């Protein structure tokens, strides 16, 4: 994605009909616009029918003309049509509205009218093609006006401080129960559904983390459908300091078993790519383009801190579960291209708690005592990260 700063104060959105011609051949579509709002964070997702490289521009506010600051995205090869003739009202204290129109005959334009602005982040994702735009409040204003749905998820007020990640205390843990609602996830032995395992483990993990003084936000506490973008929007909106996504694995090879922990990495084994394809909701053939996309990832403190977090959790699971469940296999620590980790701007970890397709693993994943033991070890690892590792990272900051 290319970036440029607009120098003109005018941003025209031309209605498709006024261009005087029928839709040109070979264009894709702007399929949908979604948004999620929180006090210090807003996310807009521009869904496209096919991948496209957008140009990003910024226009400062014009108080004399009563025009807000704007971010705009020119998306070549896209057609808008009439469905977006009316602006999409946001009104969350950060974004006023989203406007969509045809900039030229073969280029769509999406404009974000901004009320408050600190910084923004743009990510292009594939399968399905979409552009994810995150707008953050100014640091000194974070936690102010802005409404939004974070309150429904128990977001703590301090979570919007927006300090550099390696200077923030680790207080809020966001636990993401994978899949849910229309998406059952993997289905294994005896009809065991991944979405049921993840929800049970997430709720149990919440108890273990709270017992250690953490504030905990669940992305879902019931059987409901959530997109990957919404899961991480909940995490960002809650001011999460750590993001833990829990899943259950599956394989056509019934002998595969054990716990696996993943941090983000674009280069991965073929088996991990197949797993990432399932968790990302893309076909295996689409994972290699996904790898090329993730190859452009920024290398931030969050990435390094994710590895440190994973090592602590892995150590606790390996020692604690090995003592209490000697038949369970040694957990593996791996890396893979998971969207849910890419979309999070905080230390993030994805845990596959076992294989629903393995007889013994499936039996354990149905056992509340096993899930309690797993939750305890995960919580111990996060606690160790908070108390021992994170402070050392902050001390080493130049």
What are these regions (language model features)?
Residues 48-50, 75-77, 114-116, 134-137, ...:
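Flexible glycine-/small-residue-rich
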Residues 97-98, 331-350:
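Short glycine-rich, acidic/polar surface loops and turns
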